[in-house]
Amino acid sequence: MNTIKKIVLTGGPCAGKTTALVKVIEHFSSLGYKVFTIPEVPTMFTQAGMNYLTSNKDFFYVGEKATLLTQLHLEDSFYKMAQTLEQPVLIVCDRGVMDISAYLSPQQWQDIIGEVGYTQAQLRDERYDAILHLVSAADGAEQFYTTSNNAQRLEKADEKGLQIARELDKRVIEAWTGHPHLRVINNHEDFDNKLNRVLKEISNVLGIPQPIEEERKYIVKLTGNVPNSIDSDIVQTYLAGEPNCEIRLRKRRFEEKEVFVHTTKKRISDTEQIETERQISSNLYESLLQQADPYRQTIKKHRKSFIWKGQYFELDSFESPINDLMILETKGIAKQESVKFPPFIQVAEDITGNTKYYNYNIALKK
């Protein structure tokens, strides 16, 4: 049976999805994949006459429900088509089902998915192999923000429109938070870096060996409140494994919900590794804990995830086995690019590449 992977490209307005889709099709088709792209359903509906800003509540509700049903039908239809092929298939969705929830009240969303016969967990956590969120140009790359590439866009290129776009960016990230393979793609000084990060993240999902890259990490102190952060509690356990292979179990708690993820990082050379990640059930999680590495302790930490000037940050406050360490990490920033530190962060030390501060080594029993 062929391999089928389904990912979502999402993000705020003017994030670069259209250009990224073209790159994805070209790149992975050249590697032998059949690439299907599911079009953005709300844009299709708007072009057909749907008005998402209507004051008619019944029309709005029925329209949003129809949008969801169409999205589900398109995805399921192309998945069935993919199953008939022998070559590996990559299905790329221009936005996914949870994007719809970002434009609804929580109660409206629960009512609609209840009528359709789905749960939040089924739609967010189980339908897709990865979610790639491209940060809007309205946050940190305002000079590139435009509405000319989508006539249906309502967020105009003025200060009010930019603020609306930033707020939508945040709501879309919140809608997908909890998915085990959510990746936020920063804005970059060079747009090609942003596109290359998309290709790298998809390659990881497909199990294609990737160059080993050091993410930028810093020991920091928090000097103020973190605005618009998404908070979660993480319990991380390392399992016993073969040499050059790191196996990690993670339980992440977010808004009273728990997600369990199994991750394997296998180094195949001095410069390349293969990383695989999958969501698992709570029962399998409990069972796999029996294979915990006896030489390592469980890590517990509180994470604040946030975007600042187009760059995505994760701020981890460690609670166990140490409780006086705070590490700030930002992903996908090229070496020649500068990190845009927020004013509420005080940097004590740059620890990029310092193996002492790898979680895997922090967990070592002393």
Stretch-by-stretch model annotation:
Residues I7-L9:
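Hydrophobic anchor at the beta1->P-loop junction of P-loop NTPases
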Residues P13:
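The conserved Walker
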Residues K17:
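Conserved lysine of the Walker
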Residues A20:
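Hydrophobic positions on the alpha1 helix immediately C-terminal to the Walker A/P-loop
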Residues I25-T70:
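Conserved substrate/cofactor phosphate-moiety recognition/catalytic segment
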Residues K65-D125:
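Glycine-rich phosphate-binding loop used to anchor ATP phosphates in small-molecule kinases
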Residues Q107-E174:
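A glycine- and Lys/Arg-enriched "phosphate-lid" helix/loop adjacent to the NTP-binding pocket
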Residues E126, V184-N187, D192-K366:
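Phosphate-end processing signature that detects enzymes handling 5′-triphosphorylated RNA
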